Amino acid sequence: MNYPQLPVCRRPKVAILATGDELVFPGSTPGHGQIVYSNGYALHALARSEGAETIDLGIAADTLGSTAAGIRRARESGADILVTTGGASVGDHDLVQQALRDEGIAMAFWKIAMRPGKPMMHGRLGAMRVIGLPGNPVSSYVCAFLFMVPLIRALSGRSEIHHRHERAVLGKDVGANDMRADYLRARLEERDDGALVAIPVNHQDSSLLANLAAAQALLVRAPFAPRAEAGTPCEVLRLPA
């Protein structure tokens, strides 16, 4: 005690921009081809749980002008991190990458060998870091957990920024994996001998938000991992409670 000065870090500012004409806010009635917007609420909660301040940029329409306007608002707000959700793939309405390039992004990568979350991107617009997340709810959250959270921790000055891998055993058989790292949503149980058991949820579709909500962890499967039977050792990452 009795230190005249202490090193401190400012809380990072995270701006969150959703994209897509198909999105409507909760409480609205979805029209044909529309869905209720959920990603932003999960991302705001996740960022705040790590000590960040968040800025809600709303939903950009599927036009370059609307998407670019949202990106510029993020820069004007002084955000340290811009997180976009949706529009990160290569369809006619996936305009985030083009809007970011038009604004001058230095792209670090686009597309990663993991499931869920292949069409993720990352780069920098000046001092602002940019993370472009997929639009599917599970993909968006898993990528934010794996990439946004460590970035927030690093900008907060923490020495421990990565998620801790825990040892467990499989609670049921899992099939062989392909060339992508797989992050299976799983429930956790504890055996009488104290061993942690990871039980993958039955359906791993990246649109099934309820199955993510029921999971306590991500079961990590390496690329080309062979088929594994129940009782095989494995590694998990605990999700926020």
Stretches with model-predicted labels:
Residues 19-20, 82-96, 134:
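Glycine-rich beta-strand-to-loop/alpha-helix junction loops that act as flexible
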Residues 25-26, 90-94, 141:
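Short glycine/serine/threonine-rich phosphate/pyrophosphate-binding segments
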Residues 5, 23, 89-90, 227:
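Glycine-rich nucleotide phosphate-binding loop and flanking beta-alpha elements
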Residues 1-84:
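Phosphate-binding glycine-rich loops and their immediate beta-loop-alpha structural context
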Residues 14, 41-48, 68, 72, ...:
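Predominant activation on well-ordered alpha-helical scaffold segments within soluble catalytic domains
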Residues 60-71, 90-111, 120:
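Short catalytic-site patches enriched in acidic/histidine residues
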Residues 32-36, 59-60, 85-89, 110-112, ...:
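Glycine- and other small-residue-rich loops at beta-strand/loop junctions that grip anionic moieties
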Residues 99-241:
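Flexible glycine/proline-rich
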